[in-house]
């Protein structure tokens, strides 16, 4: 028999380790063929779990059938696979990519999704405001921006940027077309007064410049307003609203033009619109345009910017436009009196409409009648203007070197953020090509065989890597066809991660393929490693599916796509790659080299010449034909010396580098080193110390994923978010109240709910330490003023119970109309209420019966306060324009409210722990008042993006518990041992604890992304440990021997898989996204490192100490099974031929027919050493001859060469004679041996009787006796000769 045909442990290099002389059938029986192990138990030659081995045999039979079918139809399988994979790849053309933050990182499910759905359903949009922000910082972190030059530079940038235009749909759009500005009252009669107000009321811009006269330069208007009779072009830089109003009132009175100036005066009075910017200090007192009324006009001293900015700034309407200091100044330091002494940044906010507000604003305007105006077009106009704003700032900084030299100016808008996310969300073709090229090169180099090109695997290995790339692309295409939307997480991570994990399957298959060239190779490969690959892919895909329960859309999509790709890779590894192996077998059989097999001639290996070992009466020729003649002539052939052949391949020879293999290293060096007592002690102590330290460090693990990590690094938006988070930590939020609540009767509960936010940390207070007024307080205040005016004029006799007189004021008449409202639709007015009814009581509680009638009047006649309240009342109150000369007393009643909000400003939120504490505090308030009967919820960026952390740890713990429970069941099914599964799960738990500790040391905070990686790490750790456990369970011997055999089998695939996965993960460092680098790249590398240490170092030692019992325990030999029975022979009466079951056909042809013994399979029991007699045989004689010079040596005293696997039994030949002869004498062993004498020479004489009955009742009886002698030549392979007698 050819020595290369002996089944061996797979070697990743394809090297045949000569020291490995036991076949896998004897020492890994259930791994190679569970049916043989089952037969051993049935015959009482071994004990073990019969159920477990039976189930394993069922698995193996199915995989063997699959392998046979694939090998038989290899070309067809490849053709169909290419068609299917190509079809799925076409699906990539339909892939959609989501890049907007709110589409990707907002938690799905739970209360947050219900709250957002309620907001969307009620008011038709999720966002409450759109902002264009600008931050200015200094280059020098120690410098301050609290000086006039910094504010003037800030002004120059803002003036240029806010003046940009955008041309869309044949229309020009500017800031005034889309900015958020206060509403103006409507008038009847003289329309131009209303037009003047609309042109003068500017956009709302939150800026520190509002503390100075220069802030007026931002307000415009673009073209000066001309008032008839007033020889002045009105601009906010020269406008004194109070004096202009007095002039107009006087002028129109002189001209006897009737106009309700009282309404305008009340409008200005309630908003505290006075002198505008005329009395504010100038940044440059020497500027000739600085008004004479400025307090520092012509002053030679620069203004004290810090003192002026302390406490915040006020806009032109002081009552409703107070910009908190924390919003406009960042990185502030104060003196003892609390005044600003130093600041690092200035911030301005241009407030824009939302897309729905802009759509509603222009829906009925002539400007868009020809456009087919839609909300989508409104959004496009808004986004285009924001892009132009950012572009204008960039161009200005390039032109104005003075500003760029001293300051950093960052612009941020939601449109710019969406653009840059969309730009970088597409996969990088260069990174993918580099990753594939490196993996292909690694596979080529590790699978290349320099000394034996025929048995090399580099070509099929490279084909396997390319197949994994193909199947990965097909899996992503299938995801696109299924409607799964891509995002930055999936496009940047999935291709590399899938390639790294998929190549692991290729190395496992090539490791098994490294065995000898055999006809049924494919089915045997799948029979051995198929269960491991199936388990590995299932555990990884299962981990991804489990991680999909993390309620973050971006990660949910990532997990689903990764799971689909893993299933695609599994199908390619079990169906397509074996077909490639089947085709490569033909190359091996043809004797062609691995590389350029079509270019080089057939490779002919030079035979090794060695001194012959000629046992007495034995003829042997390795791989030679043995002519069989009737006269029993024998031709002696020279034999090879296996001992010399063995020495030619030992390390240290001239070819030691080329012949190095991880399997040999694991068996001869690595595992024996691990099994030393002091190594075990140090490893276990180090492992326990690392575990304890990790558990302690994990208690300090913080939650958090900053928004800055979601933005590509080195972008302007990334720099803005870094400065904003570090210097401001400013956010806006809203407390939303819902429907199913009686607002008129529960006003005090609403007030208490609002007042409760005073005690919430990080909420900005007003100058008095309280909170800004919300809509109900402004509503009540307006009614209170009307009630006060009515009471005064009623006492003066300007109004009576039945009517009012011409000298009554407009507000008193409006109050009269409000007082007589009953609140009933069928009887809306009752004048009797004038004497008894009050608009508000002494506590500020609004009249409950007419609450919604009053609301209609307030929303229309106090529009500045209504808009400034940011209440977003829905349904929107009905309109009622009050006219003093209108005698209809009926006021329309608004619909009951189902949505209202209270605005709050938050500051100092620089990390997730602070935001999480704030969310918890506000959520507690929400739950508390929910119990009081007020349906409510908070809204805003902190709740949208950080809500996931409130339940993240409990959700992660629950998912991990379910995954570990499922893993316990799955591992138990694969290993068929509960104790082995428990050890694997314990190892995984320890690895998780170490990963938590490593996250703390690396500063990686716990968020949804690390949660997904932690769940995935369970599947990866299972793959590492289960492969070692499987080898341990299926090996024969004591624990240390089984660990040695297990590491010999698994070290190569594990190391190669980890290295290729590491290369693929390392390629993630090229991503422009910080979250990909920190949370995917770094954390996956940590998982691989922890997995490598625990699985390759700690777990083998754990198995050697408390590992489970082997599946099969031989009863006759400690380190191998008993020799299996030969295959029964089936005879055919009709054809006169005999068949060997599961073997090759034999014929009773002529004596001259030659036989090729080297094609026999050692795994076939019929070719093994015969040590038993089946029931159909009759044993007539057997004897055992022992050499006299043998002495027993204990295992401890045997030579060091026993560290290698013990030599295998070899077949000796026997001769067949026509007459019985005595057994031949046994030659002396060629060298001393340490093995028992019964292994040296075995002689068996079975007697076979065959009876044949013919139709003529004649019976022919033939009795044949064969003397079969088996000799074992140590330590090399036996020299064989066959002697037949009959």
From Swiss-Prot:
Q: Which residues lie on this side of the membrane: Cytoplasmic?
A: 1-76, 449-465, 512-532, 584-677, 953-955, 1029-1056, 1104-1286
GO BP terms? anterior/posterior lineage restriction, imaginal disc; axon guidance; Bolwig's organ morphogenesis; determination of genital disc primordium; eye-antennal disc morphogenesis; follicle cell of egg chamber development; gonad development; imaginal disc-derived wing morphogenesis
Q: Which residues are glycosylated?
A: 142, 298, 335, 388, 807
Pfam families, A to Z:
Sterol-sensing
Compartment list: Membrane
Transmembrane residues, as ranges?
Answer: 77-92, 428-448, 466-486, 493-511, 533-553, 563-583, 678-699, 932-952, 956-976, 1008-1028, 1057-1077, 1083-1103
Q: Low complexity: which segments have biased composition?
A: 1199-1216
* Deletion phenotype: Embryonic lethal with epidermal pattern formation defects.
Which GO terms of the molecular function aspect are on file?
hedgehog family protein binding; hedgehog receptor activity; lipoprotein particle receptor activity; phosphatidic acid binding; phosphatidylinositol-4-phosphate binding; smoothened binding
Q: Where is the composition biased (Polar residues)?
A: 1141-1152, 1165-1191
Provide the membrane-side ranges marked Extracellular in the record: 93-427, 487-492, 554-562, 700-931, 977-1007, 1078-1082
Topology relative to the lipid bilayer, per the entry, is: Multi-pass membrane protein
Q: Where in this chain does the record put each SSD domain?
A: 428-583
Q: Where is this region: Disordered?
A: 1116-1237
A single GO cellular-component term from the record reads: cilium
Q: What does this protein do?
A: Segmentation polarity protein. Acts as a receptor for the hedgehog protein (hh). Associates with the smoothened protein (SMO) to transduce the hedgehog signal leading to the activation of wingless, decapentaplegic and patched itself. Participates in cell interactions that establish pattern within the segment and the imaginal disks during development. In the absence of HH, represses the constitutive signaling activity of smo through fused (FU).
Q: Could you say which protein family the record assigns here?
A: Belongs to the patched family.
Q: What is this protein called in UniProt? A: Protein patched
Tell me the organism.
Drosophila melanogaster
């Amino acid at each position: 028999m050819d020595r290369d045909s002996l089944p061996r442990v797979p070697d990743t290099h394809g090297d045949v380790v000569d020291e490995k002389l036991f076949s896998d059938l004897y020492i890994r029986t259930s791994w190679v063929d569970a049916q043989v192990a089952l037969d051993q138990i049935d015959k009482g030659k071994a004990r073990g779990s019969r159920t477990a081995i039976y189930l394993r045999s069922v698995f193996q039979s199915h995989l063997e059938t699959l392998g046979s079918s694939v090998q038989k139809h290899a070309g067809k399988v490849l053709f169909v696979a290419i068609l299917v994979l190509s079809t799925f790849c076409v699906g990539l053309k339909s892939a959609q990519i989501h890049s907007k933050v709110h589409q990707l990182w907002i938690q799905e499910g739970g209360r947050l999704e219900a709250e957002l759905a309620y907001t969307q359903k009620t008011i038709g949009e999720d966002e409450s405001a759109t902002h264009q922000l600008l931050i200015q910082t200094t280059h020098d972190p120690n410098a301050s921006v609290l000086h006039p030059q910094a504010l003037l530079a800030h002004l120059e940038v803002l003036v240029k940027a806010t003046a940009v235009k955008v041309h869309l749909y044949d229309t020009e759009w500017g800031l005034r077309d889309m900015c958020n500005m206060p509403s103006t009252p409507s008038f009847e009669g003289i329309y131009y007064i209303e037009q003047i107000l609309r042109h003068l009321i500017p956009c709302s811009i939150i800026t520190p410049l509002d503390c100075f006269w220069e802030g007026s330069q931002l307000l415009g208007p673009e073209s000066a307003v001309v008032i008839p009779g007033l020889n002045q072009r009105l601009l906010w830089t020269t406008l004194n609203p109070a004096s202009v109003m007095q002039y107009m009132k006087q002028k129109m009175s002189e001209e006897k033009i009737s106009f309700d100036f009282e309404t305008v005066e009340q409008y200005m009075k309630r908003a505290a619109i006075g002198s505008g910017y005329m009395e504010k200090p100038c940044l440059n007192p020497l500027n000739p345009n600085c008004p004479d009324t400025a307090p520092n006009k012509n002053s030679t001293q620069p203004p004290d910017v810090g003192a002026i900015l302390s406490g915040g700034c006020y806009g032109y309407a002081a009552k409703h436009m107070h910009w908190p200091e924390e919003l406009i100044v960042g990185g502030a330091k104060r003196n003892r009196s609390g005044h600003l002494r130093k600041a690092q940044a200035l911030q301005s906010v241009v407030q824009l409409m939302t897309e729905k507000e802009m759509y509603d604003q222009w829906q009925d305007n002539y400007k868009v009648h020809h456009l087919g105006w839609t909300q989508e077009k409104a959004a496009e106009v808004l986004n285009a203007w924001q892009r132009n704003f950012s572009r204008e700032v960039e161009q200005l900084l390039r032109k104005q070197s003075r500003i760029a030299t001293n300051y950093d100016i960052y612009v941020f808008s939601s449109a710019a953020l969406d653009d840059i996310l969309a730009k970088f969300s597409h996969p990088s073709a260069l990174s993918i090509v580099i990753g594939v090229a490196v993996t292909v090169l690694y596979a080529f180099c590790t699978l290349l065989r320099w000394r034996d090109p025929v048995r090399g695997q580099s070509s099929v290995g490279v084909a396997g890597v390319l197949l994994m790339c193909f199947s990965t692309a097909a899996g992503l295409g299938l995801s696109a066809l299924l409607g799964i939307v891509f995002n930055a997480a999936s496009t940047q991570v999935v291709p590399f991660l899938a390639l790294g994990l998929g190549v692991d399957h290729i190395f496992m298959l090539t490791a098994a393929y490294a065995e000898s060239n055999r006809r049924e190779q494919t089915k045997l490969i799948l029979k051995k490693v198929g269960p491991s690959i199936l388990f590995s892919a299932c555990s990884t895909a299962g981990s991804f599916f489990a991680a999909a329960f993390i309620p973050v859309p971006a990660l949910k999509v990532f997990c689903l796509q990764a799971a689909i790709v893993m299933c695609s890779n599994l199908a390619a590894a079990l169906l397509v790659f074996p077909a490639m192996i089947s085709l490569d077998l033909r190359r091996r059989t043809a004797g062609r080299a691995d590389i350029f097999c079509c270019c080089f001639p057939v490779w002919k290996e030079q035979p090794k010449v060695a001194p012959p070992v000629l046992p007495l009466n034995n003829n042997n020729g390795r791989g030679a034909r043995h002519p069989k003649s009737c006269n029993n002539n024998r031709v002696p052939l020279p034999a090879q010396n296996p001992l010399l052949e063995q020495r030619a391949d030992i390390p240290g020879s001239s070819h030691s580098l080329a012949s190095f293999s991880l399997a040999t290293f694991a068996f001869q060096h690595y595992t024996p080193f691990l099994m030393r007592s002091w190594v075990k002690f140090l490893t276990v102590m180090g492992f326990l110390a690392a575990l304890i330290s990790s558990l302690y460090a994990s208690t300090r693990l913080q939650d958090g994923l900053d928004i800055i990590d979601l933005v590509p690094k080195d972008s302007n938006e990334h720099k803005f978010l870094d400065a904003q988070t570090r210097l401001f930590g400013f956010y806006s939020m809203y407390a939303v109240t819902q429907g199913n609540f009686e607002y008129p009767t529960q006003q005090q509960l609403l007030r208490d709910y609002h007042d409760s936010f005073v005690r919430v940390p990080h909420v900005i207070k007003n100058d008095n330490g309280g909170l800004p007024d919300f809509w109900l307080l402004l509503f009540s205040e307006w009614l209170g003023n009307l009630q006060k005016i009515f009471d005064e004029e009623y006492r003066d006799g300007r109004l009576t119970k039945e009517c009012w007189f011409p000298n009554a004021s407009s507000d008193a008449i409006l109050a009269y109309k409000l007082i007589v409202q009953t609140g009933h639709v069928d009887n809306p007015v009752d004048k009797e209420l004038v004497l008894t009814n009050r608009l508000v009581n002494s506590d500020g509680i609004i009249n409950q019966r007419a609450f919604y009638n009053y609301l209609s009047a307030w929303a229309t006649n106090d529009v500045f306060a209504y808009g400034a309240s940011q209440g977003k009342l829905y349904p929107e109150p009905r309109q009622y324009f009050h006219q003093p000369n209108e005698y209809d007393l009926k006021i329309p009643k608004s619909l009951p409210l189902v949505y209202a909000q209270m605005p709050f400003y938050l500051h100092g939120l620089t990390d997730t722990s602070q935001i999480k504490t704030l969310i918890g505090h506000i959520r507690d308030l929400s739950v508390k008042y929910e119990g009081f009967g007020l349906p409510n919820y908070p809204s805003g960026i902190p709740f949208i993006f950080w809500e996931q952390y409130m339940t993240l740890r409990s959700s992660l713990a629950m998912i991990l518990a379910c995954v570990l429970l499922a893993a316990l069941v799955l591992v138990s099914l694969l290993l068929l041992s509960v104790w082995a599964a428990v050890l694997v799960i314990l190892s995984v738990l320890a690895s998780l604890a170490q990963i938590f500790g490593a996250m703390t040391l690396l500063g990686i905070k716990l968020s949804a992304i690390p949660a997904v990686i932690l769940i995935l790490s369970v599947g990866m750790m299972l793959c590492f440990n289960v492969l070692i456990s499987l080898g341990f369970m299926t090996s024969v011997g004591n624990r240390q021997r089984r660990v040695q055999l297990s590491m010999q089998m698994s070290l190569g695939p594990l190391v190669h898989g980890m290295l290729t996965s590491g290369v693929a993960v390392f390629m993630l460092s090229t991503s422009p996204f910080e979250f990909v680098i920190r949370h995917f790249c770094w954390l996956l590398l940590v998982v691989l490192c922890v997995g490598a240490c625990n699985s390759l170092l700690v777990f083998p030692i754990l198995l050697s100490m408390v590992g489970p019992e082997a599946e099969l325990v031989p009863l006759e030999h400690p380190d191998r099974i008993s020799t299996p029975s030969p295959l029964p022979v089936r005879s055919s009466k009709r054809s006169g031929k005999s068949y060997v079951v599961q073997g090759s056909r034999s014929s009773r042809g002529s004596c001259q027919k030659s036989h090729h013994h080297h094609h026999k399979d050692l795994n076939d029991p019929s070719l093994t050493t015969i040590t038993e007699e089946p029931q159909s045989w009759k044993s007539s004689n057997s004897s055992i001859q022992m050499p006299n010079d043998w002495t027993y040596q204990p295992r401890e005293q045997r030579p060091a060469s026993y560290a290698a696997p013990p030599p295998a039994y070899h077949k000796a030949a026997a001769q067949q004679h026509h007459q019985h002869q005595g057994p031949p004498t046994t030659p002396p062993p060629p060298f001393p041996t340490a093995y028992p004498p019964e292994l040296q020479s075995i002689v068996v004489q079975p007697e076979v009787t065959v009876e044949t009955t013919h139709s003529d009742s004649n019976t022919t009886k033939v009795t044949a006796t064969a003397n079969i002698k088996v000799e074992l030549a140590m330590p090399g392979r036996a020299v064989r000769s066959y002697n037949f007698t009959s």
